[in-house]
């Protein structure tokens, strides 16, 4: 202790305080740190104590905090004076570690990092030094109220962010209990630590390591540390939200991991540290981090006490369990968020702690901090400057493309890199807010976010946590840039912030939809689009809706998206607060018309669409449910709606559904345009047609998505029919009411819509281009069956029904065909028997019979030679079917190749008369008819198979045979009409023969075939005279 104390004194003060001074303050918290600044030595003991008794660890932390707080007094008679500069440093360093980070970082850096590394494995974090850092950050956040966290980390970053940070984390870890304590205590602690860090540049390593170990041990008891650390963790998330979130997602002590992640990314951590460091500076208005840190400590401590230390502290632990490792950051964020919803004052202070990462930055204090922080960021990294420049460009634009693009970028990366981008986004948004306030802040944030986020890109929790804090903070912060509402939670979502928020929300939605429910709603109303997006998050815990919402929102340009997001979050809240805001905005954006939304989209539209699509793709990959919905054009809308919020699903689903419509048929666009109120603005833009507020940009987004859905649907079902039905349905849904789709979305409307769509969808199909498609489906049942597979999709229901009806009709026709075939087979058998009889009978009749046979025979030469005799015996022996069947076969083939329609027409006419002929009469004329029958019977047999399809087409027995006969007729050279005329003539001329034939034929098919054969064989003119003669 003495050694540590001396080190602290040497580093922090010229004057050495008696060890007793340390002991006396440390005695109360002796268990925690013995000599707070021997506390490196003792803090490990204290840590042991916390480890020994998790419940007591908070007490140990408190004692340590007290000791730290009093240490500056002992070490520095000017607890606050020294604290302001040293304390800011100590804030920056959080405790020893944080202070040491700037001063002792050089010498300590390696040791503390190593110590942290050694400790980190023990700690919850997988990254040793980072783990410690998270502890420090979390602890510092709690005690320092994120001022420490932000300040210490930034200070560390400025000096030696990595090692110092790690040391700082240790100090913070020791301090976690202090979070509850007043900022002065933290300041004292920091002052001491600063002295310690300074004094312990070389010796400080061991003290810092000890402190880190103590903090690590304190944190190691995850349950305990989360209690103290959770409050810290909320600030931590702000510092290294993305990192923390990632770490949080992974390990039980995600904050450490997160912090570890941040620390592990030295450059990112450094940027974050600088940002946080300068945030305190901004608070204190001290050019040096210490000054800032001090002010921040003073301000944030209270705020953190209120927001983070008190509610945040308590809230954080529960969110921590909820979020788990990954959720820790979110929890932290939520702590600040919770704080922010509870009270803007506490929220702002809480945010300040958060602002180091994103929220605090935007806040009033963080904004000033950001100014120096921005400087630090600039100094820390050029990329941060670039980000800052982007952010600066964004705030002016409000939702300008510059802002949106960063958001888009962050959104796209969010799944992986998006984290870093997302933190950037938050910084961007913070910057947007600060752009009005102080563009520099974003740089610091960017340094933290960009550098840090890149490290934490892996964990998604970070974006979520970041998003959570960012969302709330952004809502508050971005509100401020747009309307200075950002500082107050929900004061308005600036146009510029909303796009960023939408992107952030999209990213957030991807990682963590759970934490957003409470504050996103409140912020949604306040923030409008931004909150709405967090709300989407919460509502879309699945992340599917949130994602869709976000995508739609992004596509919409945040005016519309917020509406959806709000709908998603809670239709009521959204409708009451956000819907008006969103609609106002949406109407603002699309209000002018779609152009308004499109303007926003144009601002960030170009970047948005691709990021949204990327997010969509990522979400689809991530979220199987949504992909399924997307897979089905109709399915996607219904899926989302039941999932989290009908309104969101509806609004987004509506867009997706109509989108394909827009994509595929413009008519549906029209439908959607009329159906949607925003459609007026949307009408200018087919993509936007769905709705000015919700359909517009989501239209684009969903469109892009929808085309896929359409493709899936089209592929699954007949693309034309399915898409048409979908399109029609979608327009109907939108027409029925955007409210249905937006408010009720697919959940309620899914059935209703389908019910309506089933009746309406089919009508639309006929009404629009679909009607032709519908008949073709009948003609081409295979397509319909394909689409029938997709009926699961709600949009496919109407198609499904149609397909079912078509299938039933087809089945009936097939049955008829089967029956006709059976009848034809019977008729063929009858024909054969009749032919045999006729073959015998022609002999009986004599020359007339022979003549008739000759006439019947198709080949005149045979007749001339008197092949009648031959034929008679031939017929008797073999039956005329074979020879004539050959001809008939050729004819049948020709029939198959011939015009089925024309044949069917001609044959249908003949066949119709034939059906009446039931009994096969055998008059003398029958001989001819019998031969013809034989011929026709054979063709009927041959043609029957082809006729089946024809029958399926025409649906009648007559139709199948008639097509065959007509085909033969065209081959013969007689047109179907001519054939029909010929048939009529023969019928009239040879009433006994022609008519008997028909009566003979029990089935109209046989009669029609016979007629056709007779016409073909006889030839029109020859038949007529001969028929008349006979």
Swiss-Prot record:
Q: Name one Pfam family in it.
A: KRBA1
Bias regions of kind Polar residues — which residues?
124-143, 397-418
Q: Which cysteines are joined by disulfide bonds?
A: none
Where are stretches of biased composition, namely Basic and acidic residues? 157-168, 419-437, 654-674, 1019-1030
User: Residues bearing Phosphoserine?
Assistant: 101, 177, 182, 184, 229, 253, 355
Tissues in which the UniProt entry reports expression: Expressed in brain (cerebellum).
Q: Where is this region: Disordered?
A: 27-56, 80-208, 225-255, 281-505, 634-788, 870-1030
Keyword Iron among record annotations: no
Show the ranges annotated as biased composition (Pro residues).
760-784, 913-923
Known InterPro entries for this protein? KRBA1, KRBA1_rpt
Name the source's superkingdom: Eukaryota
Name used for this protein in its record:
Protein KRBA1
Name of the gene encoding the protein in the UniProt record: KRBA1
């Amino acid at each position: 202790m003495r050694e540590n104390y001396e080190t602290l004194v040497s580093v922090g003060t010229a004057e050495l305080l008696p060890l007793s001074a340390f002991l006396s303050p440390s005695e109360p918290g002796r268990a925690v740190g013995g000599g707070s600044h021997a506390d490196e030595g003792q803090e490990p003991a204290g840590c042991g104590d916390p480890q020994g008794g998790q419940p007591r660890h908070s007490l140990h932390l408190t004692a340590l905090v007290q000791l730290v707080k009093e240490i500056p007094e002992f070490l520095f008679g000017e607890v606050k004076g020294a604290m302001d500069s040293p304390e800011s440093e100590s804030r920056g360093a959080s405790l020893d570690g944080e202070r040491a980070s700037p001063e002792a970082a050089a010498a300590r850096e390696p040791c503390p990092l190593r110590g942290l590394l050694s400790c980190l494995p023990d700690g919850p974090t997988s990254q040793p030094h980072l783990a410690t850092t998270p502890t420090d950050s979390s602890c510092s956040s709690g005690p320092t109220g994120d001022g420490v966290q932000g300040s210490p980390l930034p200070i560390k970053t400025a000096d030696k962010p990595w090692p110092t940070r790690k040391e700082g984390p240790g100090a913070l870890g020791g301090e976690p209990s202090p979070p509850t304590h007043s900022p002065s205590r933290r300041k004292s602690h920091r002052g001491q630590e600063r002295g310690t860090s300074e004094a312990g540049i070389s010796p400080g390593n061991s003290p810092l390591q000890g402190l880190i170990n103590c903090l690590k041990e304190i944190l190691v008891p995850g349950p305990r540390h989360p209690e103290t650390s959770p409050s810290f963790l909320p600030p931590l998330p702000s510092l290294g939200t993305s990192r923390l979130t990632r770490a949080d997602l992974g390990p039980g002590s995600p904050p450490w991991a997160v912090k570890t992640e941040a620390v592990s990314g030295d450059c990112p951590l450094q940027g974050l540290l600088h940002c946080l460091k300068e945030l305190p500076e901004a608070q204190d208005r001290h050019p040096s981090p210490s000054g800032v840190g001090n002010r921040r400590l003073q301000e944030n401590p209270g705020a953190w006490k209120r927001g983070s230390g008190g509610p945040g502290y308590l809230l954080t632990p529960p969110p921590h369990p909820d979020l788990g490792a990954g959720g820790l950051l979110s929890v932290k964020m939520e702590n600040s968020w919770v704080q922010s919803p509870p009270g803007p004052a506490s929220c702002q202070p809480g945010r300040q702690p958060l602002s180091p990462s994103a929220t605090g930055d935007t806040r009033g204090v963080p904004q000033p901090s950001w100014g120096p922080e921005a400087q630090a960021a600039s100094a820390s990294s050029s990329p941060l400057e670039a980000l800052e420049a982007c952010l600066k460009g964004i705030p002016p634009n409000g939702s300008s493309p510059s802002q949106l693009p960063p958001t888009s970028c962050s959104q796209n990366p969010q799944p992986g890199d998006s984290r870093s981008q997302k933190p950037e986004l938050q910084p961007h948004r913070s910057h947007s807010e600060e752009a009005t306030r102080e563009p520099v802040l974003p740089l610091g944030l960017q340094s933290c976010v960009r550098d840090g986020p890149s490290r934490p890109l892996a964990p998604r929790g970070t974006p979520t946590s970041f998003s959570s804090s960012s969302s709330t903070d952004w809502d508050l912060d971005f509100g401020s840039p747009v309307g200075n509402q950002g500082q107050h939670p929900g004061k308005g979502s600036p146009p510029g912030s909303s796009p960023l928020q939408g992107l952030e929300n999209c990213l957030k939605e991807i990682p963590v939809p759970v934490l957003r429910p409470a504050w996103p709603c409140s912020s949604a109303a306040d923030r409008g689009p931004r909150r709405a997006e967090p709300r989407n998050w919460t509502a879309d815990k699945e992340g599917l809706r949130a994602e869709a919402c976000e995508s739609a929102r992004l596509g919409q340009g945040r005016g519309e998206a917020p509406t959806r997001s709000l709908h998603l979050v809670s239709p009521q809240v959204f409708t009451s607060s956000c819907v008006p805001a969103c609609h106002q905005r949406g109407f603002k954006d699309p209000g002018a018309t779609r152009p308004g939304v499109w303007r926003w989209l144009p601002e960030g539209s170009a970047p948005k669409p691709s990021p949204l699509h990327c997010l969509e793709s990522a979400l689809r990959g991530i979220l199987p449910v949504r992909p399924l919905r997307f897979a089905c054009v109709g399915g996607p809308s219904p899926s989302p709606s039941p999932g989290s919020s009908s309104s969101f699903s509806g609004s987004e689903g509506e867009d997706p559904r109509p989108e394909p419509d827009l994509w595929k048929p413009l008519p549906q666009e029209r439908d959607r345009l009329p159906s949607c109120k925003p459609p007026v603005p949307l009408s200018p833009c087919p993509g936007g047609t769905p709705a000015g507020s919700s359909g517009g940009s989501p239209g684009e987004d969903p469109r892009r998505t929808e085309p896929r859905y359409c493709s899936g649907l089209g592929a699954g079902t007949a693309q034309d029919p399915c898409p048409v039905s979908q399109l029609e349905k979608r327009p109907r849904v939108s027409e029925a009411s955007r409210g249905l789709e937006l408010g009720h979305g697919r959940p309620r409307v899914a059935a209703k819509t389908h019910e309506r769509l089933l009746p309406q969808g089919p009508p639309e199909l006929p009404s629009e281009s679909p009607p032709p498609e519908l008949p073709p489906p009948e003609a081409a049942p295979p397509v319909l069956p394909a689409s029938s597979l997709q009926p699961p999709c709600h949009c496919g229901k109407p198609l499904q029904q149609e397909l079912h009806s078509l299938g039933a009709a087809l089945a009936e026709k097939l049955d008829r065909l089967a029956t006709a075939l059976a009848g034809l087979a019977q008729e063929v058998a009858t024909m054969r028997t009749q032919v045999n009889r006729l073959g015998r009978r022609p002999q009986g009749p004599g020359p007339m019979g022979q003549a008739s046979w000759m006439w019947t025979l198709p080949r005149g030469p045979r007749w001339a030679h008197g092949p009648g005799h031959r034929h008679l015996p031939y017929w008797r022996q073999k039956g005329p079917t074979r020879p004539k069947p050959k001809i008939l076969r050729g004819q049948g083939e020709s029939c198959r190749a011939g015009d089925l329609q024309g044949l069917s027409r001609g044959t249908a006419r003949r066949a119709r008369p034939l059906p009446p002929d039931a009994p096969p009469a055998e008059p003398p004329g029958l001989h001819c008819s019998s031969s013809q029958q034989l011929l026709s019977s054979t063709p009927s047999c041959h043609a029957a198979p082809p006729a089946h399809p024809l029958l399926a087409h025409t649906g009648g027995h007559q139709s199948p045979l008639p097509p065959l006969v007509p085909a033969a007729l065209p081959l013969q050279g007689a047109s179907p009409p001519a054939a029909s005329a010929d048939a009529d003539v023969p019928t009239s001329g040879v009433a006994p023969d022609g008519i008997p034939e028909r009566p003979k034929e029990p089935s109209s098919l046989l009669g029609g075939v016979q007629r056709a054969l007779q016409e073909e064989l006889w030839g029109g003119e020859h038949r007529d005279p001969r028929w008349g003669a006979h």
